[in-house]
């Protein structure tokens, strides 16, 4: 990124320099901005890797240059990318084809942004030890796939072929769309004895071949009044081969007002008084 002493940039601007043009100076600046020094940031990197289950990775610097005890795997990079793509800011940055920051014009090194329909970008890389490395992601019909290659001299073509293959195998399955009523719950002391419960958002998960999802609604036996529409009352969980793979909140689809004691008394007197 060709930073100079005295330059002042926003953290997000440094991230553009890091992700679009592989600015090693930007990586060091981010490390100092976030953690105060490089060593503390590297410690944070390794803590995050452990939390994400990246068992074949260990980092010793923030910029990814060859160093002792600094390594990763394609699988671990895929895990990290899947986590990062959940962040809207990350998606926006890595999918940017070019940006001007002050007097700096940054053009994304990732050619797939222009070559492959639905490409979200992510990151190119090269070192003597690793060779050409590339992490890419693409989205079609709500399904996002991540592709990682290491030491690949024909990575652009390989990624397009691998992503095509992945999309031919996978589909995004909606087990329960937002708004679908999946259960009901008893309301104690309410104007309605029960209220329906619906999925707060789409319950979705990617599947391959003949795989099927099983949906289980988990609700309490009863809840106290009042109940208002949109109130979270339970969970809808999706299972694949007996393993939970996704969940969404179950919310009240209708209200149930609290019946006050005086109202209960008047009803009693109406029938028995």
Where do the model's predicted regions map?
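Active-site-adjacent loops and short helices of periplasmic peptidoglycan-processing enzymes
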Residues: 1-75, 84-87
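Domain-terminus/edge residues, biased toward the C-terminal soluble/receptor-binding domains
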Residues: 54-58, 66-71, 75-273
């Amino acid at each position: 990124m060709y930073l100079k002493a005295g330059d002042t940039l926003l953290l997000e601007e440094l991230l553009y320099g890091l992700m679009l043009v592989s600015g090693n100076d930007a990586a060091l600046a981010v490390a100092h901005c976030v953690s105060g020094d490089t060593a503390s940031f590297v410690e944070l990197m390794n803590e995050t890797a452990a939390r994400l289950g990246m068992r074949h990775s260990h980092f010793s610097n923030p910029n990814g240059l060859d160093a002792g005890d600094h390594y990763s795997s394609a699988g671990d990079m895929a895990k990290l990318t899947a986590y990062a793509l959940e962040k809207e800011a990350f998606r926006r940055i890595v999918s940017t084809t070019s940006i001007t920051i002050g007097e700096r014009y940054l053009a994304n090194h990732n050619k797939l942004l222009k070559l492959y329909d639905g490409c979200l970008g992510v990151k190119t890389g090269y070192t003597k030890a690793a060779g050409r490395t590339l992490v890419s992601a693409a989205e079609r019909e709500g399904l996002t796939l991540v592709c990682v290659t290491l030491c690949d001299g024909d990575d652009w073509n390989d990624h397009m072929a691998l992503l095509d293959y992945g999309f031919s195998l996978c589909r995004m399955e909606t087990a329960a769309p937002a708004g679908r009523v999946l259960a009901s719950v008893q309301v104690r002391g309410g104007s309605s004895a029960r209220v329906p419960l619906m999925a707060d958002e789409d319950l979705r998960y990617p599947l391959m071949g003949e795989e099927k999802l099983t949906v289980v609604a988990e609700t309490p036996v009863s809840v106290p009044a009042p109940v208002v529409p949109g109130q979270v009352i339970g969970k809808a969980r999706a299972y694949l081969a007996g393993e939970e793979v996704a969940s969404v909140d179950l919310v009240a689809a209708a209200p149930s007002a609290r019946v006050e004691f005086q109202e209960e008394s008047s009803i009693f007197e109406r029938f028995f008084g």
